[in-house]
Regions:
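Substrate-binding pocket helix/loop in short-chain dehydrogenase/reductase
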Residues: 97-99, 103-108, 201
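Short C-terminal tail/terminal secondary-structure segment
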Residues: 1-2, 93-96, 147, 221, ...
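Residue(s) in the substrate-gating loop at a strand-loop-helix junction
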Residues: 142
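Short, small/polar-rich loop/turn modules that mediate ligand/substrate recognition or access, typified
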Residues: 174, 179, 231-233
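Alpha-helical segment proximal to the catalytic Tyr-Lys
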Residues: 127, 171-172, 229
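Active-site helix of classical SDR
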Residues: 122, 158, 166
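A conserved structural motif in NAD(P)-dependent oxidoreductases
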Residues: 205-216, 227
């Protein structure tokens, strides 16, 4: 099935490993050229190498640094062309801790990466998308953002904020053929940060198993495609039914 993405330039943050790497590979499979952005520049380069040097580049970037983000977007546009697709995958989750035990720096880091970082990257590419009258913005939330999470006060708060941000971007982009949608994953692969609660959380999944990075990546590829051109402001949960209630 042709998703109509051949030749599109996609920027994926947090693309050095795991979920971000899967997102990049899925979009490359559909014919996109990839800009892999990550604080870990070597990891970003490895993802780009796996895709192929002729179709992907890696860029070291701290997305909390607004000036660096602007500079990297300029590099990407020089190397690959204007950014058509922005996948805000980069995120941070601290070691699970209740509010009474949470460190202020953990709150600040969650806000800086999960929320401000998403703003910085989207803000850098959105005007060009509007001007060219085509664009796709994907923001990564979490089921914890929709439901709350024990010991995840900062993470849950920032992920719910990302939903509001994306839906507002959707309104601003709608008349310019720029869509903005949210992916809210559940448990995707082993997660060391959630290890104290991991087994109990998996038991809450209706499918009784964790998801794989490709499950999220395939959903992202669809939302970026021409087949999803009338979908904007949506929140797609990729949870295996973790958010469903049953007796």
């Amino acid at each position: 099935v042709d998703l109509g993405l051949v030749g599109r330039v996609a920027l994926v943050t947090g693309g050095a490993r795991s979920l971000g790497r899967a997102d990049a590979i899925a979009l490359a499979t559909e014919g996109c050229r990839l800009a892999i952005v990550d604080l870990n520049g070597e990891g970003a380069a490895e993802t780009a190498s796996e895709i192929g040097a002729e179709r992907a580049r890696g860029y070291a970037c701290d997305i909390t640094d607004r000036g660096r983000v602007a500079a990297v977007v300029s590099e990407i546009e020089r190397d690959l062309g204007p950014v058509d697709i922005c996948v805000n995958n980069a995120g941070f989750i601290y070691t699970v801790a209740q509010l009474k035990d949470m460190k202020d720096e953990d709150w600040d880091l969650n806000v800086a990466i999960n929320l401000t970082g998403t703003y910085n990257v989207t803000r850098a590419v959105f005007p060009g998308m509007r001007e060219r009258r085509w664009g796709r913005v994907i923001c990564m939330a979490s089921i914890a953002g929709l439901m709350g999470g024990f010991g995840q006060t900062a993470y849950s708060a920032t992920k719910m904020a990302v939903v509001g941000f994306a839906r507002s971007v959707a309104l601003e982009g709608a008349r310019y053929n720029v869509t903005a949608n949210v992916i809210a994953p559940g448990i995707i692969g082993p997660n060391a940060a959630l290890s104290p609660l991991y087994d109990r959380m998996v038991k809450r999944v209706a499918m009784q198993r964790e998801g794989e990075p490709e499950d999220v990546a395939n959903a992202i590829a669809f939302l970026c495609s021409e087949r999803a051109r009338y979908i904007t402001g949506a929140v797609l949960t990729v949870t295996g039914g973790m958010d469903l209630f049953t007796f």
